[in-house]
Amino acid sequence: METQLYIGIMSGTSMDGADAVLIRMDGGKWLGAEGHAFTPYPDRLRRKLLDLQDTGTDELHRSRMLSQELSRLYAQTVGELLNKQNLAPSDITALGCHGQTVRHAPEHGYSVQLADLPLLAELTQIFTVGDFRSRDLAAGGQGAPLVPAFHEALFRDDRETRAVLNIGGIANISVLPPDAPAFGFDTGPGNMLMDAWMQAHWQLPYDKNGAKAAQGNILPQLLDRLLAHPYFAQPHPKSTGRELFALNWLETYLDGGENRYDVLRTLSRFTAQTVFDAVSHAAADARQMYICGGGIRNPVLMADLAECFGTRVSLHSTAELNLDPQWVEAAAFAWMAACWVNRIPGSPHKATGASKPCILGAGYYY
């Protein structure tokens, strides 16, 4: 039997742009990732998406128009990837598209990801799978995180418990025991608060190389107040997003006189400390943690993680397991599309709390 090619598209809570990754499968067996393309969000698009995070007028119309705009950008990204790899749409078995999350409310049984999936199928001329979270929510799950099943398929070791940390806008961990099902949950903010602080105080999308945070000092009292949020004491399964940890939440803990560099530095330690606390509680026997996502490019955050974990847990990039840390999430949704095509349940129900494993997503022919 010939192997199959799939493409995954991911745009996360950082809202910086869309990643597309090409993977090769043999039925349900992973063979590797072969290519990547990235399209940054124009500032105007990003602002409109952020505006939709809060309740406002004409939300239905705005969400549908943004779904179409996003799908055109996704199609452009897929086209660039195909050109890079010298492939035609007919070479691709399926396209897995996560969409752009604008609301995540598992307590109400829904999570909203913007994407016009039929339009994306039409524009790319590729069979498209999307709306991955709804099936898990229908089975009583949180709808997030979905990546632990993918991490388990690729990164599990039969000899030891491993942890996989994804640092996007939200940080989440997957715990991969050698002899039990994988599980995971959102640990709390990843880059999201740091990015929001950068945008508010420097008009920059993020802290490149941690350069601004490196000039600040940790504010212990502020850190303690942030760590007291009740989310961190909740048992897993659990998931979160901008609904809980937005800039206006942070500002309720500030008196206005703080040095902006110090607040940014404190937010880095806040992310690292919440990750450490989560891993210490849920994966006390893990000695190796593999890191992916945009946060791995922030040396201040990586130093904070190293300081929190000390010699207890060894920190690595997923590149050491043959998958670029910037490719992991998009590759996961390509893998989920392959699961859909092969009728394989791809949901990490032990992570989300769903009542059973489910085949995730809905498919659209062009």
UniProtKB/Swiss-Prot annotation:
ATP binds at residues 12-19. HAMAP family: AnhMurNAc_kinase. It comes from Neisseria meningitidis serogroup C (strain 053442). Gene3D superfamilies: 3.30.420.40. Transmembrane segments: none annotated. Its EC number is 2.7.1.170. InterPro entries: Anhydro_N_Ac-Mur_kinase (IPR005338), ATPase_NBD (IPR043129). Pathway: Amino-sugar metabolism; 1,6-anhydro-N-acetylmuramate degradation; Cell wall biogenesis; peptidoglycan recycling. This is Anhydro-N-acetylmuramic acid kinase. Keywords: ATP-binding, Carbohydrate metabolism, Kinase, Nucleotide-binding, Transferase. One of its GO terms (biological process) is 1,6-anhydro-N-acetyl-beta-muramic acid catabolic process. Catalyzes the specific phosphorylation of 1,6-anhydro-N-acetylmuramic acid (anhMurNAc) with the simultaneous cleavage of the 1,6-anhydro ring, generating MurNAc-6-P. Is required for the utilization of anhMurNAc either imported from the medium or derived from its own cell wall murein, and thus plays a role in cell wall recycling. One of its GO terms (molecular function) is kinase activity. It catalyses: 1,6-anhydro-N-acetyl-beta-muramate + ATP + H2O = N-acetyl-D-muramate 6-phosphate + ADP + H(+). Belongs to the anhydro-N-acetylmuramic acid kinase family. Signal peptide: none annotated.
